Amino acid sequence: MAGVEKIKERILEEARAQAEANIKRAEEEAAKIIEEAQKEAAAKKAQILEKAKQEAVDVKKRLKAMAELEARKKKLQARQEVVDEAFNKTIEKLNSLPDREYEEIISQMIVNSVESGSEEIILSPKDKQRISPGFIENINKKLSQKGIDGKIKLSEETKNISGGFILKSGDIEINNSFEAIIRMKREEVEAEVIKALF
């Protein structure tokens, strides 16, 4: 039986050795798998961090571009407000001229605008009170000197304009208010005004 025991012992030893070798091989393979997984995880982590950094840079660029755009918009808006104010002040200055000077400007504008000489002049309520009694008569004289039949009349009607006048011929009204003239001329002169202001 000693021979059987030896065989048994030998089989057990070989089985143990085989098991240990298998365990060792499995542990080595597991260690390799873990190492590769760790390397892969580190690489993915680096990729994710790099991507996050790039996204942060992109977000920063976008935010900067948006801030610059907003600053340009505000600057443009401020410029526009200054330009608007300049044009509004022009209207205010015209309206605040001394009555005689104001009347002369309006008179000249009317003479230059009249075509038939029989139009009606519509003023603002304020200007209607402001003009002298001989205002229309003076305009008609100037028209006659230009060879135009001077039969201009001051309308009973008034319009809500800050200054200037409305020239009415039948059903047609031509707006010669300061606001309308400035609005029409603004495009032509705005670039020069901006250049002068800035």
Curated annotation (Swiss-Prot):
Coiled coil: none annotated. It holds the Pfam family vATP-synt_E. Keywords: ATP synthesis, Hydrogen ion transport, Ion transport, Transport. One of its GO terms (cellular component) is proton-transporting two-sector ATPase complex, catalytic domain. SUPFAM superfamilies: V-type ATPase subunit E-like. InterPro entries: ATPase_E_C (IPR038495), ATPase_V1_Esu (IPR002842). GO terms for biological process: proton motive force-driven plasma membrane ATP synthesis. One of its GO terms (molecular function) is ATP binding. Produces ATP from ADP in the presence of a proton gradient across the membrane. Belongs to the V-ATPase E subunit family. This is V-type ATP synthase subunit E. The lineage of its organism: Bacteria, Bacillati, Bacillota, Clostridia, Eubacteriales.
